[in-house]
Every structure is written in structure tokens, then in C-alpha cells.
Amino acid sequence: MATTAELFEEPFVADEYIERLVWRTPGGGSRGGPEAFDPKRLLEEFVNHIQELQIMDERIQRKVEKLEQQCQKEAKEFAKKVQELQKSNQVAFQHFQELDEHISYVATKVCHLGDQLEGVNTPRQRAVEAQKLMKYFNEFLDGELKSDVFTNSEKIKEAADVIQKLHLIAQELPFDRFSEVKSKIASKYHDLECQLIQEFTSAQRRGEVSRMREVAAVLLHFKGYSHCIDVYIKQCQEGAYLRNDIFEDAAILCQRVNKQVGDIFSNPEAVLAKLIQSVFEIKLQSFVKDQLEECRKSDAEQYLKSLYDLYTRTTGLSSKLMEFNLGTDKQTFLSKLIKSIFISYLENYIEVEIGYLKSRSAMILQRYYDSKNHQKRSIGTGGIQDLKERIRQRTNLPLGPSIDTHGETFLSQEVVVNLLQETKQAFERCHRLSDPSDLPRNAFRIFTILVEFLCIEHIDYALETGLAGIPSSDSRNANLYFLDVVQQANTIFHLFDKQFNDHLMPLISSSPKLSECLQKKKEIIEQMEMKLDTGIDRTLNCMIGQMKHILAAEQKKTDFKPEDENNVLIQYTNACVKVCVYVRKQVEKIKNSMDGKNVDTVLMELGVRFHRLIYEHLQQYSYSCMGGMLAICDVAEYRKCAKDFKIPMVLHLFDTLHALCNLLVVAPDNLKQVCSGEQLANLDKNILHSFVQLRADYRSARLARHFS
């Protein structure tokens, strides 16, 4: 195994190195078994290898010493070189300081010399300038302009500078001595001003922005500079309104000018603001007037729609213009422009809105009643009418015929949707067009119109008509349409409440009008709920009355006391069948007409009255043994019917009634035991006794003794 330095590079493991050495030595490993193992040969190999390692170690050591000597030599040379560089750097730094001091000295001298030259040159330049102006002034005084600056059209810029200065000087001269020359200078001033504006106009038409900038810079010191801006604004608008959308045209125009105006004028914000002012006060104001004045008196609906649309689009344009630099208070500037256009229309907006909403709502309602061939009648309230209504509710006395509505509820979702849609649009216009301080008050006025026409003129009228159409409780085969009124009224209440929350609340949420609106809404709903409750109560009375008619007409005394006890089929009676059919139909109608807890409340009330009716009805008859079985079958059927109510209390009442009916058939000896049973134990003894008294064998079997 050759020994090299590479074998000892990291990672080096001595055990592995020995293992490899042994494995390569013949007779040193485990190959060939124990017989092949030669320890002498292995020892010899180890001795030789150790000698090789010693030789290699000496060789490496000599190499390390040589490298260390070389490193020390190079370190000394490098240190010497660094010292030389430090000395050289110190010399250079000294030279730099000397040069810096010399430069500062020279600069001071130059500045001093410059100040001296300027002190001499400035008066000289002023003198030269004054001399030139005197020369030009003499030409005006003589009446003949000979200087090249006035005769050469290419030097209009220099001429403008001269005439502008002469114009200022002429203003200081006395009029009586220099009136003629002042007049000539003023005339030349005006001519040059016109030439410059004409040059600016021509450059604008050619699209030469650089020339426009030069001329504008010259005109900046002339009185006609504002006229130059006016010309620029006028020419910018030529051909700018080619589309059908004036607002989009105006936005594009302002965007184009905004990109260009900074390259032409030194005061771009003022120029752009003046352009926008021109667009609003001339173009937009004229357009708005044409659109609105045409329909202001003849068509309120179109007027309001146009006003809302134009105002919205104008404010939308204003929002786009807010992106431009128009000076410090651009918000106020744009608001004033919008106000100047619309102020005459916004001052009386809410009066137009209220007037239109009233007439439109009245028309929607009248159109509906006309489609039904219905002449809206005045529903009496107060005094005699209220007294009649109370007596009608609490007795069965006929106090005049009820109104026959022929099944018509006089409620229309289409009418409601139309009224709500008109009001929604009115709220949107109110939000956009009202002054923030007037917004809650205006929104409240719109809400009162909605209450008047939707809640009072439509819903309340339908409820009153529905109440008047409910027959008395003793009417036979009465058609009960009030539940249809209830169903539609509930749907309309939900729509009304949704609009209140979605469209009115955001407009009044932070104002005192909120509590006023909530109170008005509460009063309206309470008033209508009271009428609904009254109508439902009277409808339930009619239902019970109809059941009474069925029972009176169909139930015979022989049903429960048959002549032939042996020839009786044990099933429910015909009266029971018809009552159950009627009740199931009414229960289904109630479930379809109401929602939530209202269904349970009404069904519980109907169930309690139904139970009372059957209880009192059963008390009218005498029962034989077989008749008692029939009564139990009837009550069992009534109980099945009561299950459809899904009201635990009603079911419990019929369970108890069913248990009471068992008293009609139980053997006399077991009567006391049954009375103390789980379902009857809590009942009053008189109730139990009253049922037992209905038995045909009450006297013969001496059943009274069980209750003595």
C-alpha cells in the first residue's frame, strides 16, 4: 500500500486505515481461514509501513519549514512597502493642503474682482439701456420709427420688450407736454399686443407649442395676457363637442388641455381653472337650461329624472376634474361652479318632488281601483260607526249588512311595488339633490307620502274593507276572505320594512328625524296589527259559527242514543266528518296566510275555541253505551284533526276531552278508578260529574253516589 499525504486528508479515521492495511497484506486478513493467517508477515508489513510514515513525516516537516521561511521573508518585504507608501501619502497630503489654500486665496480674489466688475458693469448696462430707450423715445417724439427693432417683423419679441418699458415710462410723464408721444407709444403698444395675440392664435392653430410658449412669455407683461388666455380657451373648445355626450366631451377636453397647458403658460393652474369655469358657466349651463326648462312646467316626472341625471353627471365630471391641479381649494371652486348651474332648480326641488310623488301615487291607486271597477268608499270611523263595530265584535246581533267584496282583497303587490319604486327613486333623488342640512327633513317628507298612500290609502283601506266584509258569526256558508287580506298585508309589510331600512335609514340615521320616523312607523304598524287582530278574531268567530251550523244541521240526538243498540256501526258520525273537513281546510288556509309565531298564535286560539265548541256540543246530548262509543270515536277524529295544528296545548285539550268521553262508557263499578286516573285527576270534580250526568244510565245505575 503506497503511502501518500492524500490518505490523511480529513475526514481521517485511524481504525479504517489500519483495517485497509491489514486487508491488503497477504496472510493478514481473514481470507482463507485461520490456517492462512501469518502474524510474522503482518508484523513485517507494519514495521515497513511505520518506516515509510516516518520518512514521509520528515519530508513534510522540511517542506513546512521552507514555506515558513518564505512567508516571513514576504511579510518583511510587504511591511517595508507599506512604510514607503505611508511616507508618499504624507507628502501628497501636504501638497494637497498647499494647493487647497492657494485655490481658496485665488477664489477670494476672483469673487472680489467679480463684485468690482459687477459694480461697474451694472450702472453701465443701465446707462446703455437708458440710452437705447431714450433713442427709441426720440423716434416716437419725432414721429418716425427708423430702428430695426420696430421695422423688422422678425424682431417682434425685442420690440415688445422695448415698447413695454416705454409704455411704463410714458405713464409717468405729464400729459400736457407729452400727450402726443404718449398716444403714439400707446398705439404701438396696442398694435404689438394685437400682433402677439394673432401670432399666438396662428401658432395654436398650427399646433406649435414651443412658439405658443414663447409668445405667451412675452405677453405675460402685457395687459392683453388675459385676452391671450381667453383666445387659447376659446380655440381649445372649437370642435371639442362632437359627440352626443357633452359631459364626456368636457372631460376629454380638460384632460387634453391639462397635458398641454403646463408647456405653454407659466401659470397653468389658473389657465386650466379658467377653462373649466368657461365649460361650466357657458357650455354646461346652457345645456342644462335647454334640457330642464323644456319640461319644467309641463312634465314633472321627466323634469325630476333629467335634473337627477344632469346633476349626477355634472358631479361625476367634477370628480374627474378633482384629479387636476387647480390651485389650493379646488373642492370649493368646483362646488361653486356646480351650484351656479343648479341653484335655481335645487331651491324648490323638494316641492316639485313632493307634488309629483303625491299625484303619481294617487294615479297608481286610482288606476288599480278603476281596473277593479271599484268606487273607493269612505269607511266610517268614530262615533256611531265605532260603537256598531264594537257591538258587532262582541255579539252576534246583525247591525246592518256586511260589505260583499266578492273575494277581492283590494291589495295588489303590483301597486305596492310601483309605489315603493316611485318612493325609492324619490329617496335617491333626495339624497343627491338635497342640501346636507335639509336631507333628513326632505327624506321624512317623502316617507310621510309613502305612509299616506301605501299604508293608509291602500293597506288600511283594504283592512277596513276586509273587516267590513267579514260576515257575522251566525252567517251560514260564509266566504272568509280576510285571511287572504292577512297574507297579502304581511307580504306588503315586509316590502315596506325593507325599503325603510334600505333607503330611508341611511338618509336619517344621524339626525333627530330618525326617532320621529321610527315612531311613525311603529304607530302605523301597531294600528294595522290591531285591525289584523280584530279581523282574525272575527274570522275565527265565523269559523266557529260555521262549525256550529254544521253540527246543528248534521248531528242528531239518535246518533248518541240509537233506538237499536245492536245495529250500530262503531265509527264517527257524519257531523264529525264534515266538521273535520272544514277545520282542516281552515288550518291549511291559516298556515298559508301567515308566518312565524303568528301561525302558532292563531292556530292555538282556533284550537282552544274549537275545543270549547266540541266540549259544549257534547254536553247537549244524552249517551247510551253505544252512543258513548260513537262520541269517543268522534272525539278521536277531532283529536286527529287537532294534531294538524301542531300546537301541544290544543292536542292536550283534546286528549283530556277524549279521556272525559271514556266516562260515558266505563262500567259503573270502575267509574271512580277512571276519574282518579292520570289524565282526569287534576280536573274539577264538577266537570267530571257533568260528563257522567250525560249517561243514559245515570239515574238507574245511581252514579251520583260516586260524586257525593
Swiss-Prot record:
GO terms for biological process: epithelial cell apoptotic process; establishment of planar polarity; membrane fission; mitotic cytokinesis; non-motile cilium assembly; protein localization to plasma membrane; protein transport; vesicle docking involved in exocytosis. This is Exocyst complex component 5. The modification N-acetylalanine is found at A2. Residues 40-101 form a coiled coil. The exocyst complex is composed of EXOC1, EXOC2, EXOC3, EXOC4, EXOC5, EXOC6, EXOC7 and EXOC8. Interacts with EXOC3L1. Keywords: Acetylation, Coiled coil, Cytoplasm, Exocytosis, Phosphoprotein, Protein transport, Transport. InterPro entries: Sec10-like (IPR009976), Sec10_HB (IPR048627), Sec10_N (IPR048625). Component of the exocyst complex involved in the docking of exocytic vesicles with fusion sites on the plasma membrane. GO terms for cellular component: cytosol; exocyst; midbody. One of its GO terms (molecular function) is small GTPase binding. Pfam families: Sec10_HB, Sec10_N. The modification Phosphoserine is found at S412. Belongs to the SEC10 family. It is found in: Cytoplasm; Midbody. The modification Phosphothreonine is found at T122, T395, T405. It comes from Mus musculus (Mouse). PANTHER family: EXOCYST COMPLEX COMPONENT 5, SEC10.
